[in-house]
Amino acid sequence: MGKTLKEIIRILEHAGDVKAYALIGGLAVGGWIAPRATRDIDILADLSVTTRSAIEEVLKKLITAGFKGSLEIGGPEDDIKFCIKVVSGENVPVDIIFASRKWEAEIVEEGMVVEVLKGLSIPLVRPEGLVVLKLKAGSFQDVADASKLLVEAEYDLQRLRNLAKRARVDKRLERLMEKLGLT
């Protein structure tokens, strides 16, 4: 996984339209609290101009580097508008989701560089942003990750509540915090 992550970082660092990027999946959760097993890499990226052609340029760079995959385009009602889904030569699945809302761009740009694998540092979305993204996604694992972050990580509660409101998961957040005895 380390080789794949290094290559992804190299490509994103040299992709002209990429303003910022940060890990958002299990690796990111493990950067803030006790790591959990994960087999994939999830990244949220912010482009200077979020267009299909700019995203296709990133995909071309990945394919040239030996990744296999495609660009998935969401519909108007989908939370995810553009997502590159690729698999590395190491057989590691990678999802690169592109920010389509202002709050998403903000949490990427506010990412903090953390060592996630020995000798390998990358920006991570801060705990407040991760909790909101996990509540947006809503799977069992996502809610479990959000719960662990709420209980174990250090975060700014007011910032978390503001982000949750902007992402329209504020009621979900309050219910989860109540269930966890955090209110």
Predicted regions and their residues:
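Compositionally biased terminal segments of proteins
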Residues: 1-183
